[in-house]
Swiss-Prot record:
InterPro entries hit by this protein: AdoMetDC_fam_prok, S-AdoMet_deCO2ase_bac, S-AdoMet_deCO2ase_core
Catalytic site: S113, H118, C141
Known catalytic reactions: S-adenosyl-L-methionine + H(+) = S-adenosyl 3-(methylsulfanyl)propylamine + CO2
Keywords: Autocatalytic cleavage, Decarboxylase, Lyase, Polyamine biosynthesis, Pyruvate, S-adenosyl-L-methionine, Schiff base, Spermidine biosynthesis, Zymogen
Single GO molecular function: adenosylmethionine decarboxylase activity
CC cofactor note: Binds 1 pyruvoyl group covalently per subunit.
E.C. designation(s): 4.1.1.50
Site (Cleavage (non-hydrolytic)): K112, S113
Top-level lineage group: Bacteria
Official protein name in the record: S-adenosylmethionine decarboxylase proenzyme
Quaternary context: Heterooctamer of four alpha and four beta chains arranged as a tetramer of alpha/beta heterodimers.
Species: Pseudomonas syringae pv. tomato (strain ATCC BAA-871 / DC3000)
Amino acid sequence: MKSKLKLHGFNNLTKTLSFNIYDICYAETPQDQQAYVEYINSVYDAERLTRILTDVVDIIGANILNIARQDYDPQGASVTILISEQPVTPTESQIEESPGPLPETILAHLDKSHITVHTYPEIHPVDGIATFRVDIDVSTCGVISPLKALNYLIHKFESDIVTVDYRVRGFTRDVEGKKHFIDHEINSIQNYLSEDTRNGYQMTDVNVYQENLFHTKMLLKQFELDNYLFGDATSNLSAEQREQVTAKVKHEMLEIFYGRNVAV
């Protein structure tokens, strides 16, 4: 087993894991399309997202400093959680009656680790294809690794397409003063995915090793049309219509996966 790196002072590396998670469905009528947006807004409201992110905090072994959350009109929600490595206990100055902190004291809190999530439901104006996007950032300072949250978040949002970016910034010093720009071995984000996740997705990497920048795109392999239908479309489609909708949904997924418009 490789011995731990002995550091001089605090581990100053910042590790950031960013997700763009997409869930696709087909809603045939305007009524169903509106119902889909309302469904997403209710299932993934700020309160539910807070519970999910709180689980992430537990998984990566961090402690919550502060939570800010908001539901938006007409759609979408966001949550931001400030976290730290160590448990936070109130100091005497926080408990006693005294003047509030100076601005520089408040800013000191803002450079702590954080987790954010934003949701973006949207619907194609003609084809009835509905896309639910979730953007998640897990940024940590010190020894806490955001990579521990990978599998949980991918499965929690029943992801059809996932774009994952991981980067390490800054440097830390060992006891001899030598700089270390990364403190763990990694050649692909896929190394940190569970076997069932790797087997379930088609994946491609674009990695810039010298910049400690890693990028993985994931597309769900198994396609069952019934998993992508919402409202009347679950029972009203003819065999021919099912073929057409299958083509539409797969085309949408490929465009998102490759990040460009693809000719039909």
